[in-house]
């Protein structure tokens, strides 16, 4: 079995790292460059940087901050938020990103995933999916499952999350970053049923995101959810745990990690 990755996530707005609950109630967590350097030193396998209001605000990519973060980080860096075009991929790669993450733009124009992966290779094209479990009323008419939300979780697209992940991989996505909006920031653990459903449906790595409150939650995402990597923010940002502690817990549970 390949080593499983632990990926701290920097949600950035206004040039600061923030963390919310269910995509709302944002709380300041610090300077992105300082935090990125800390995770690099702690032995994180990768880092994900998401400009969480770029799309909803209609803003351009914040290249100076991305360049500053990339200069401090010597592990793979994924950048998302406001990535709209194939040209944006080139700009981010030039700024120091290793992978770029599409979300709302892929929903508006799925062909961008074909075009970007053909030009730069699927290994650097990630599709982020923000998914929310259907309400009992919706499930009664459409069946149980999860819908895809766009614009920072503000808009229900009506797309089924598992079907959307499958289509994105078919179009060339090399990785799926799967966030449970229901669990985001709640510290109640991943939505393991969602993680498992998508992991079983696609043949590329799935990164589980949304809800980590303990080190065992990370291991559960791999062992029960079937994820290839686990992403967390709150438990790392506020000093509750280090990446090293997370790797030690995963190793103790029999999960291969990079040491």
Swiss-Prot record:
List this protein's GO terms for biological process: L-histidine biosynthetic process
Q: Per UniProt, which keywords does this protein have?
A: Amino-acid biosynthesis, Cytoplasm, Histidine biosynthesis, Lyase
> Which pathway is this protein engaged in?
Amino-acid biosynthesis; L-histidine biosynthesis; L-histidine from 5-phospho-alpha-D-ribose 1-diphosphate: step 5/9
Pfam hit, one: His_biosynth
The family database entries (InterPro entries) matched by this protein are listed as: Aldolase_TIM, His_biosynth, HisF, IGPS_HisA/HisF, RibuloseP-bd_barrel
Cite the GO molecular-function annotations of the record.
imidazoleglycerol-phosphate synthase activity; lyase activity
Enzyme class comes to lyase
Q: Where in the cell is it found?
A: Cytoplasm
- Enzyme Commission number(s) of this protein: 4.3.2.10
Write down the chemical reaction(s) this protein catalyses: 5-[(5-phospho-1-deoxy-D-ribulos-1-ylimino)methylamino]-1-(5-phospho-beta-D-ribosyl)imidazole-4-carboxamide + L-glutamine = D-erythro-1-(imidazol-4-yl)glycerol 3-phosphate + 5-amino-1-(5-phospho-beta-D-ribosyl)imidazole-4-carboxamide + L-glutamate + H(+)
Assembly and partners are described as: Heterodimer of HisH and HisF.
Q: What is this protein called?
A: Imidazole glycerol phosphate synthase subunit HisF
Gene behind this chain? hisF
